[in-house]
């Protein structure tokens, strides 16, 4: 990692990460490796009653050698990882009785009927009448709320919360292949191809909502041709191309839950590739049930980069001069669909006593009646991108008058066009 004093050929960064891939040799060599981590080998966290689930295995191999001795070599490497990591969710949830509209349990606030809202005869503002026995009649319960209640876990702890300990899975595979060809003693060519595949499954805080996949696929191809024109004059041409796409799916993506629940207004405005996923529900005082707002899912990130560079290095006396330029074409394309299938917020404002709100109203009572405080929907989903071409020309001279001092002259010119 270079954080300062790097060459003029590098720019537009606070630091440079230099990475190299090994080339093959005249001898055939190979390596196998495996790195294992497991909760059975770990100590318990100080604040946890038990050890968290962890199963992580990194493994791979490299092999390299000659294709034609002294002329053509190859090197290949593979690395894989399989990980299962435990997570802990402890949700504040309503009781099964509350999901049926029964708020008569101990410690619950008084629930007022919003249909009885009327002017306060003895003052300003409005008043309401409580539901008899603090129970909402079944005929008043929202069909949409009753549909989504199936995804809300019941309390399973002595404190009245719903504890859930799923594991998050992560599978990765990486492959790199490189070839080196010595055309002559003064002309050398190499090419490298790298492939990366990432597959992750993220669990929701509510187990019935399931898991959402995160997928990453990337390819990188690089090639270089180096010529030693004279013992002190070296010419290098490089080309690189990078393609990559990241896909984050929503929870239950592909299932039209709004239509199943009877929520209208979404079927006519679907967006290809993101049809159906779980909406977002937020209740004051309870754990939210988030889906699309989790990492702004569903979304995609698509990138394409081409880069060509041409450099000439000249060594004369105590001078090491380098001149050249590069051109880079960059085309990003992003989509995200946060709140695309709806974001409903319930605060208890519809079931409180407007004349004296303290100790009255409940956000889940508002939910049971189908009366949100706010409803949001982002439409159409965000789509943004474009393309640009970046040009850079530079000159760089390292001059060493003594062993202790190294002046550096680095003029350069950059052009960026969108």
Positions of PLM-derived features:
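Short acidic-glycine motifs
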Residues: 1-418
